[in-house]
Amino acid sequence: MKVLLANPRGFCAGVDRAIEIVECALKLHGAPVYVRHEVVHNKFVVDGLKNKGAVFVEDIADVPNNQVVIFSAHGVSIAVRRQTHNIGAIIYDATCPLVTKVHKEVARKQKQNYQVILIGHKGHPEVEGTLGQSSESNCVQLVETIEDVERLNLSKNMSFSYTTQTTLSIDDTQSIIDYLKLRIPTIDMPKKDDICYATQNRQDAVKILMQFSSVLLILGSSNSSNSNRLREIAEKIGIPAYLIDGIDNIDELWFKGVDTIGVTAGASAPEVLVQEVVHYLRDKGATKVIEVGGVKENIHFPVPKELR
């Protein structure tokens, strides 16, 4: 039995930065520090930070006055930002810079009187944050499917632009974009695709891996958007794919009659979990572990200067 490891996999620059911000804040201020939402969507990472003194909350109303508050990598709305300032918090923003870019684009388009169409998953914290960048509730319309595009209320006197959640499936997003262009030929496009580099690279790596694998294991938590997209890509190709938090979630029956197992990790899953899976598979009879070539990533996002 062979094990193929996707490249790139695991932590991206935005996740590295977000975790480092929490750890630096704990070192500077001591526990507790409050984090609005899970800083990244990974159980192993979140549990580790909890053990160091991070307190994760969904509502700023649950934070006492004058405490340290960190915004998660997914970003927050203007209203949440304002609410946090109002309780006298010391604020550190761990929003991924690529998400911040989308936020700034929404604000810029609003000032130019554009109606913004956001392609994303309803209820995802990144989407909630992006929707909340507009001071007008009807400035941004959310679409998830081509059917949503068909139902859009389009004013003839309005200019339109679109943007996307950064962690979507590239293929699925493109079909929605194509339909948007069909419905609104004059729609304004982002200067560059909003799907982040790490999302694209990890999806491309899975497509390569699937050419040689009989089953795919994806290290990633169930609430991780980018990890779920990796699973969906494999399943659309016709390869069984399993999203796991770690080796405790593995079922040996998945490998019955299988000679090649692909392994990857979502952008919020640490490499230590991948290596635990590799050791597990070696113990179960894997004789070869092969790193499959892919794009080399050298992007780094620095933490805020006050934490350096």
UniProtKB/Swiss-Prot annotation:
Dimethylallyl diphosphate binds at H41, H74, H124, S224, S225, N226, S268. Disulfide bonds: none annotated. GO terms for biological process: dimethylallyl diphosphate biosynthetic process; isopentenyl diphosphate biosynthetic process, methylerythritol 4-phosphate pathway; terpenoid biosynthetic process. Isopentenyl diphosphate binds at H41, H74, H124, S224, S225, N226, S268. It catalyses: isopentenyl diphosphate + 2 oxidized [2Fe-2S]-[ferredoxin] + H2O = (2E)-4-hydroxy-3-methylbut-2-enyl diphosphate + 2 reduced [2Fe-2S]-[ferredoxin] + 2 H(+); dimethylallyl diphosphate + 2 oxidized [2Fe-2S]-[ferredoxin] + H2O = (2E)-4-hydroxy-3-methylbut-2-enyl diphosphate + 2 reduced [2Fe-2S]-[ferredoxin] + 2 H(+). (2E)-4-hydroxy-3-methylbut-2-enyl diphosphate binds at H41, H74, H124, T166, S224, S225, N226, S268. Its EC number is 1.17.7.4. Pfam families: LYTB (PF02401). InterPro entries: LytB/IspH (IPR003451). This is 4-hydroxy-3-methylbut-2-enyl diphosphate reductase. It comes from Vesicomyosocius okutanii subsp. Calyptogena okutanii (strain HA).
